[in-house]
Amino acid sequence: MISLKRIFCTCCLLLSVWAVFAQGPSKWKALEKPLNFYLANDLGRNGYYDQKPIAELMGQMAENVDIEAVVAAGDVHHFEGVRSVNDPLWMTNYELVYSHPELMIPWYPILGNHEYRGNTQAVLDYSQVSARWEMPARYYTKVLENDDITVRLVMIDTAPLLDKYRKDTEKYPDACKQDMDKQLAWLDSVLTSAKEDWVLVVGHHPIYADTDKNDSERLDMEKRVDSILRKHNNVNMYLCGHIHNFQHIRKAGSKIYGA
């Protein structure tokens, strides 16, 4: 079994990023492992609330550490999603913010609840506009490989799995249109066949969290997603966003780490 230390996941969250910043470029190189990627979520702030300086820091760090990709775990666009691939928010939330040359690498995004307040198909269609925005479907899987290490990313679409969003058709019109059972069957199938060194499932909503957000979200995630993850001994981590802070959780009786 490969040590967890051999995979380096940098979470783009305010406290953890500024902790890395305090170390300085002279120490960043020592953090490099055979396969490195950023996990970034809940980004879309039009450059405000420290989004722009953190984006610049991500670029500076990538000058010293070989970053393979950015895994974007939803809510790239606050607060009402986007209306089309030509929506100005693509510039102010994304292109003009993450403009450092070292961030011109593959981005693997999923939808968050805020994208579901807009045109979700436009988020997928942006893959035809931007060479780095690689989102082939609402849920999909991607394998990263380097130096004989393989990591399977299993990217899931969590808003349609939660009754809160499915029932609120006025605010989240696309959520109820998605086939929940089909996605869950797909997730089970992908995990059954996954043979990589590391299997990381990525969704926007947490399964377990210390938060004042609606308990029903996590109860639905526990019932529908965690029940599948626990069936498979090859799942190492569940990575998510939504709660706007950093938590590292392992539920009693589970071998899966959540962050």
Where does each model-flagged region fall?
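N-terminal active-site segment of His-dependent metallophosphoesterases
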Residues: 19-88, 181, 210
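Active-site clefts of carbohydrate-active enzymes
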Residues: 205-213
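Bacterial Sec-dependent N-terminal signal peptides
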Residues: 1-23
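Active-site metal-binding loops of divalent metal-dependent hydrolases
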Residues: 40-45, 74-76, 113-114, 158-159, ...
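Residue-level marker for buried hydrophobic side chains located in beta-strands
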Residues: 37-39, 70-72, 109, 201, ...
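Extended active-site neighborhood of metal-dependent phosphoesterases/phosphodiesterases
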Residues: 31, 78-199, 213-237, 243-259
